[in-house]
């Protein structure tokens, strides 16, 4: 809330409205903004100046805050207009026509209770000012007949004040009107008549702030009266608002029962404050500041009997060099902050809270026997004796803040402790002269001693004499070396940037928060607590000893504690002092070499960056997560038992011995464990095992694993040269095996695979250079692996005949990869169709012979022949029956010259870097992406190729030397479906 409308609610204005027929002259908001001074002042229009037209504001009803109010409003809404009328709607012109048909007598009938007309769109209420500017004279007609009760041509000062207030508010906050200032509307409106009772309207208005109340006052007379109710105007906030004395007096006379006034930052703040204190007899809270406050103001406060709270800030009191007297019998809270004054004398028998923070008085005389809170922080001119005198004069004092008062001494604190037996909170931060010697504060609960140079280990003896202490802050106490406290009620302690601090010993059953950081000399920590749940001690580089007896501790973070030894593992085992531990972080603890945990509650363990760890043994039946990134020297690992569901040991290249007992594990990755020779894997639910590059893994280990993990579905044995026929024969114990990767192995015979893996769907044999040409004959001659869908023979040495037979017979394959096959020659299905028919006839007598290609559709979807140097021609006619082929990749086939494809479902074709390509014929109506990077095709060839691709969206022609970038428009003309054409700068050769 910023500024308030008050005089616009007078009866005289209502009479003026009736006399003028409720007419509103159309004004421009821009005119009002031109008359403003831009500094947050109220805008005052001259007598001959036209007042700005204020847009009609939307009424927002908060249904969630007042269901009863919304239900009542909904009843009026539905009873006024049938539902079908709301659904069908009316045009803006219809609304204007209806408005023009209304007579002036109807508009003024029962002016006090006249209806507020709300124009509603589909989802929100709108004003009728939304009629388009194209309507011409109809706009003024609507304004004349459906006026919301704003005064007409002869505007009163109070109406203009209300408008000026809203304009100032919007300008100050940098917001624009929500209204439609140009009198136009981009949607059709509906006119809805709503009769709201005074009680219901009062309830709705209770949810509005003062700015919205001012806007609502301009709707109609009933709303004006309702929004002026004094219940809504008990708090008058003019903070940083330039309000004149006349306006403020009018406000005070209009609302004499206001209880709270804020004129902080207003001009003539002293006069405004005097007026508020002398006029508003029910004033309880007064806030002033930013200016000169005279002594007479403080004298006038005594006459304001209901006053309870006064705040004065950023002000000069009196002439700055005189004594200010303040006397009040009922004042309970006083704040005089950042003020310039020589001396203060305060007599307030009921005062409970006093703040003089950052004021520069040299003396403060207090007569406040019931004062409980005294804040004199940063009062640098207050001497030690003045502070002592002020504090001991308040025997009921419970909270004292003397931070940044450099003159405070131990003697002053001792006398305060004797005089104020109920002192609970003491903030003596940045007081270099105190050491708390002989200071007894038995009732103290909060003690803050930030940056106190006199606090040493000897001070802990006197702190220990405060048995009720709950919060202790010792940050930046540079002379503090040891802290040893036995305080049963201590709940929180903070030790930050204590450079010489070496030893911490805390015995407190209620301790729940410990903050220790940037203490480079800290070596030993001993903690006993039943309430501590989380302990974070990051970057304590010299910490060597940790003793914990914390039965509720659940999370521990010891990251970058480089000096911690293996003995720390005993603390977090079942026989240690943390039986409820769930999460342990030991990242970058580089002194750990052998980690052994036996903990029945531990669920998460992180050893990231522990490069010296060579042995890991976990007996944690509930552990579900472990992170070993950076443990690249780990040699032996035992997980017996654990609740892990997945484990990645591929980042442990030196792992040689592995023992896992994990009843819930489903995924295990050993990729890169090149020296792993002994592995016992007891994971009955394991479905995925990746043992890539485990060069020492042998047949006996594989056989034992398949026997103990019968549910394996995916097995990766890439680069496992020690695996032979015996190990592959053991795969018959895996009935669910569907994915097998034997790439980069020395296999010569695939017979064990064909016999043991009947359900296999994916077989990868990349770079198996020892396979003979007859190794795959069972696939296309005997019908082996009938469920096989994906086959990868990349970088193999199979001859052209074996490849041709495989392509001709294995029509059930969906994915085939022949990347880098040097024996791969032309893919010409056009010239071999008759040959293939004869070929199938040879094996027709066999029961396992597959259906001939002439009668069976090929299921191939993805064919990859990347980098096959001997392919020169690719021909796939309709007779080849590649009805499912969607992706064909022939990139890097440098000798490929001719491509002729007729594939009805081909979506992606990659011919990038086929630098010899000359002929491209495409009959692919569904082709969406064509890649021709670095090809020597000319523009005519590309145009001819894409002319039959009606669905082509992406065409890549980058680095094509015979194609100019300026010719891209031709391709779009030939193929209108193109959305993306990639080309390089013009490289067209002459």
From Swiss-Prot:
SUPFAM superfamilies: F-box domain (SSF81383), L domain-like (SSF52058). Residues 190-236 form the F-box domain. LRR repeats lie at residues 237-258, 280-303, 317-341, 348-373, 397-423, 441-465, 466-477, 478-503, 519-542, 550-574, 589-612, 614-633, 640-652, 653-678, 734-756, 758-782, 785-809, 813-839, 882-893, 894-914, 915-937, 949-973. InterPro entries: F-box-like_dom_sf, F-box_dom, FBL15-like, Leu-rich_rpt_Cys-con_subtyp, LRR_dom_sf, LRR_FXL15/At3g58940/PEG3-like. It comes from the Eukaryota. Coiled coil: none annotated. GO terms for biological process: plant organ formation. It holds the Pfam family LRR_At5g56370. Gene3D superfamilies: Ribonuclease Inhibitor. Keywords: Leucine-rich repeat, Repeat. CDD domains: F-box_FBXO41. This is F-box/LRR-repeat protein 15. It comes from Arabidopsis thaliana (Mouse-ear cress).
């Amino acid at each position: 809330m910023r500024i308030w409308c008050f005089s616009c609610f007078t009866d005289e204005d209502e009479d003026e409205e009736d006399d003028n027929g409720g007419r509103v002259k159309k004004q421009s908001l821009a005119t009002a903004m031109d008359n403003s001074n831009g500094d947050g002042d109220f805008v005052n229009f001259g007598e001959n100046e036209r007042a700005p037209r204020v847009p009609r504001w939307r009424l927002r009803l908060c249904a969630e805050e007042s269901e009863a109010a919304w239900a009542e409003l909904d009843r009026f809404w539905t009873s006024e207009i049938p539902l079908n009328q709301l659904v069908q709607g009316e045009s803006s012109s219809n609304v204007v026509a209806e408005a023009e048909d209304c007579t002036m007598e109807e508009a003024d009938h029962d002016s006090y209770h006249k209806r507020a007309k709300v124009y509603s769109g589909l989802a929100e209420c709108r004003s009728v000012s939304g009629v388009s500017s194209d309507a011409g004279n109809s706009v003024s007609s609507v304004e004349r007949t459906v006026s919301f009760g704003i005064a007409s041509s002869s505007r009163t000062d109070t109406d203009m004040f209300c408008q000026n207030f809203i304009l100032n508010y919007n300008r100050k906050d940098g917001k624009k009107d929500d209204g439609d200032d140009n009198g136009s509307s981009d949607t059709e409106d509906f006119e809805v008549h709503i009769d709201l009772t005074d009680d219901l309207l009062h309830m709705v208005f209770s949810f509005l702030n003062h700015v919205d109340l001012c806007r609502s006052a301009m709707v109609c007379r009933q709303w004006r009266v309702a929004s002026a109710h004094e219940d809504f105007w008990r708090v008058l906030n003019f903070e940083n608002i330039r309000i004149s004395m006349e306006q403020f007096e009018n406000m005070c006379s209009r609302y004499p029962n206001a209880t709270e006034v804020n004129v902080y930052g207003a001009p003539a703040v002293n006069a405004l404050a005097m007026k508020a204190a002398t006029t508003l007899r029910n004033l309880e809270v007064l806030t002033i500041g930013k200016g000169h406050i005279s002594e007479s103001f403080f004298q006038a406060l005594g006459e304001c009997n209901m006053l309870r709270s006064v705040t004065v800030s950023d002000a000069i009191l009196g002439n700055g060099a005189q004594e200010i007297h303040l006397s009040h019998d009922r004042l309970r809270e006083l704040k005089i902050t950042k003020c310039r004054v020589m001396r203060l004398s305060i007599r307030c028998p009921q005062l409970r809270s006093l703040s003089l923070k950052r004021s520069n008085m040299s003396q403060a005389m207090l007569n406040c026997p019931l004062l409980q809170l005294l804040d004199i922080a940063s009062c640098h001119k207050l001497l030690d004796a003045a502070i002592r005198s002020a504090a001991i004069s308040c025997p009921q004092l419970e909270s004292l803040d003397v931070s940044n008062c450099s003159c405070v001494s131990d003697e002053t604190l001792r006398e305060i402790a004797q005089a104020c037996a109920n002192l609970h909170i003491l903030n003596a931060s940045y007081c270099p002269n105190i050491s708390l010697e002989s200071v007894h504060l038995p009732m103290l609960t909060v003690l803050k001693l930030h940056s106190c140079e006199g606090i040493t280990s000897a001070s802990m003896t006197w702190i220990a004499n405060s048995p009720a202490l709950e919060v202790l802050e010792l940050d930046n106490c540079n002379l503090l070396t040891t802290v040893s406290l036995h305080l049963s009620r201590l709940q929180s302690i903070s030790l930050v940037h204590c450079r010489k601090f070496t030893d911490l010993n805390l015995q407190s059953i209620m301790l729940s928060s410990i903050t220790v950081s940037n203490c480079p000399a800290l070596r030993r920590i001993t903690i006993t607590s039943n309430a501590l749940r989380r302990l974070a001690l990051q970057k304590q580089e010299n910490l060597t000893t940790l003793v914990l007896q914390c039965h509720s501790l659940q999370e521990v973070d010891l990251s970058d504690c480089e000096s911690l030894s293996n003995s720390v593992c005993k603390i977090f085992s079942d026989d240690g002092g943390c039986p409820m531990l769930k999460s342990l972080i030991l990242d970058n603890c580089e002194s750990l070499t052998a980690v052994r945990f036996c903990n029945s509650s531990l669920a998460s363990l992180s050893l990231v960056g522990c490069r010296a760890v060579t042995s890991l043994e976990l007996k944690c039946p509930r552990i579900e997560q472990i992170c070993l990134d950076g443990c690249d020297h780990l040699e032996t690992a035992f997980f017996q038992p654990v609740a892990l569901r997945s484990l990645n040991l591929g980042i442990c290249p030196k792992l040689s011995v592995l023992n896992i007992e994990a009843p819930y594990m489903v995924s295990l990755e050993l990729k890169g464990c090149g020296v792993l020779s002994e592995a016992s894997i007891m994971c009955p639910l394991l479905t995925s095992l990746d043992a890539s590059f485990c060069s020492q893994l042998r047949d006996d280990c594989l056989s034992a694993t398949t026997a103990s993990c019968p549910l394996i579905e995916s097995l990766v044995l890439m680069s496992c040269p020690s695996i032979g026929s015996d190990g592959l024969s053991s795969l018959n114990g895996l009935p669910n095996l569907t994915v097998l990767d034997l790439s980069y192995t020395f296999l010569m015979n695939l017979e064990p695979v064909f016999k043991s893996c009947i359900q296999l769907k994916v077989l990868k044999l990349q770079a198996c250079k020892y396979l003979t040409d007859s190794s795959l004959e069972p696939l296309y001659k005997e019908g082996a692996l009938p469920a096989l869908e994906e086959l990868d023979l990349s970088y193999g040495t199979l001859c052209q005949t074996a490849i041709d037979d495989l392509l001709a017979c294995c029509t059930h394959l969906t994915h085939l990869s022949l990347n880098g096959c040097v024996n791969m020659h032309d893919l010409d299905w056009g010239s071999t169709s008759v040959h293939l028919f004869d070929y199938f006839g040879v094996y027709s007598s066999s029961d396992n012979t597959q259906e001939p290609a002439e009668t069976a559709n090929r299921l191939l979807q993805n064919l990859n022949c990347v980098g096959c140097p001997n392919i020169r021609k690719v021909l796939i006619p309709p007779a080849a029956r590649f009805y499912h082929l969607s992706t064909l990749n022939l990139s890097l086939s440098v000798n490929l010259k001719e491509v002729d494809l007729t594939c009805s479902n081909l979506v992606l074709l990659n011919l990038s870097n086929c630098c010899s390509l000359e002929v491209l014929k495409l009959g692919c109506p569904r082709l969406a992406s064509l890649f021709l990077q670095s090809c020597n095709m000319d523009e005519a060839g590309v145009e001819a190729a894409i002319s039959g691709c009606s669905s082509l969206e992406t065409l890549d022609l980058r680095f094509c030397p015979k194609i100019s970038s300026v010719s891209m428009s031709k391709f779009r003309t030939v193929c209108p479906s193109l959305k993306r054409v990639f080309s390089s700068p013009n490289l067209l050769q002459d």
